[in-house]
From Swiss-Prot:
This is Succinyl-diaminopimelate desuccinylase. It is an enzyme of class 3 (hydrolase). InterPro entries: ArgE/DapE_CS, Bact_exopeptidase_dim_dom, DapE_proteobac, Peptidase_M20, Peptidase_M20_dimer, Peptidase_M20A. It comes from the Bacteria. Zn(2+) 1 binds at residues 66, 99, 162. The gene is dapE. Catalyzes the hydrolysis of N-succinyl-L,L-diaminopimelic acid (SDAP), forming succinate and LL-2,6-diaminopimelate (DAP), an intermediate involved in the bacterial biosynthesis of lysine and meso-diaminopimelic acid, an essential component of bacterial cell walls. It comes from Coxiella burnetii (strain Dugway 5J108-111).
Amino acid sequence: MSETLNLLKQLIERPSITPNDAGCQTILIDRLKSVGFQCEHLPFGEVHNFWAWHGHQSPFIIFAGHTDVVPPGDETQWHSPPFTPTEKNGYIYGRGAADMKSGLAAMVVAAENFVKQNPDHNGTIGFIVTSDEEGPAENGTQKVVDYLQQKNIKLDYCIVGEASSNEKLGDAIKIGRRGSMHGELTIIGKQGHIAYPHLADNPIHRSFQAFEALAKTKWDEGNEHFTPTSFQFYNVEAGAGAANVIPATLKAKFNFRFAPIHTTQQLQQKVERILNYYQLNYDIQWNVSSQPFFSGNGRLATFVRQAIQEICHLNTEPNTYGGTSDGRFIATTGCEVIELGPVNKTAHHVNENICIADLEKLTDIYFRTLQLLT
């Protein structure tokens, strides 16, 4: 059994449902310490994090990832227990197999092998690992980055081991991510008897035109690196608990996924202009969960693409598709950030899995990238 597969199995066995680490980080820390890494445990609240490093020079190359996983859902729908790593037809199944315990296992084994072969390597190799990526992400990577900045540690390059590949390992890497902003909107009407609508003000009826306008608005055209901004309602609630009552309020929740084309303030102003145009009485609360970032095709991305070409014989596609990741926190330091990991098709799904053969290739890609950077 390969070292990467062995480590992945150990991690899958730990039911580390966010924000519980379930001992995963102890396994990783013990392995890294055994090859000379210095490690700091950085707990914040109930979240476990660690920071590890080997070397004392620049450039500073960081591997970043998370040990927490999403809940398995209905376990009767799994063909094997979600926290029992199970090999079948060349794949390994288990919660976290794709997102992202395979990435973590490959990064750690690659770093181990590299420092064993190059104990006096140029540069510094580091790890930022958290158990708070699948949850609120308030006490995880963001807090570790704040800690490093307080210590004046300057990061140069970061590989986030998220499942970035689409159909084949290495066919895509992320060189940026869209931002995410949530809005919680309350449309205020007047409650009344449903038989006497002239004595009430129905917030549901009032909202229709404005909601249609918001849903049909073309916020931008995107650009060569980012798809157009997306606006989606994901929850609408109204009703007074009885069939003969016009409700006093309607509550709606929506989300923007946006490129660096806009500021959050510009998007907020556009929404409020539409609501005002339709003369709605409303209250709105905003929550910016992440700002967009774009690292571009820098030195790290160039070397990662070279490593993928050498090992997987693919011309990888750099893109900015998908959701948010902890790379957004690391990018605020000015560090070049890319995301490179396994195929993402089954992430968060029942019977989550990864191709076993991809584990060694992914380990080799990380190892080769370290060679090229140092």
